[in-house]
Amino acid sequence: TGYASFPQNGAGGGEAGGPGGNPAMNSRPTDNNYGAFGGEGVFSTITGTPIGYAGGGSGGSHAPHYPSSGTAHNGDPRAGHQINIGKRYGGADGGIGNSQPASSGSDAPANLGGGGGGSGQYNVHCGGGGSGVVILRMPTAMYTGTTTGSPTVTTDGPDTILKFTGSGTYVS
């Protein structure tokens, strides 16, 4: 048929904090197989709250001819899977190729810089990567207030924080 009879599972995407994982490939196509977790991103507290950024997207999974065996590596510990590490940092889940219909990879959330999830099959799409963000933190006494664009401006103790999710500038 031209198709492999054993599962084809994608590796997870690497990101800021490390590489993605390797896919699980069992010796029999009826075993549980899944795409690998996305790479670990980085946690930052620049906004005053710990937030994960730049996580890798999970790899997609496709186990042909065995509809119940392929699963995306989306972090369901009840199913015996490891957590998709990249998801904690804005990475997205991978798709499942042998579901009906086959599923695309998930899009990563906006403004966290994470990777999109891998697709589960040739005829569906990978998820889109998340948009980035620029965050500036400075002592309020040094903040000039001169900006372009529409940054979110907040304070945390003695500091002012500017968060740009689109284009803009700050002049110090």
Language-model features, listed with the residues they occupy:
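Low-complexity, glycine/proline-biased repetitive segments and flexible coils/loops
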Residues: 1-172
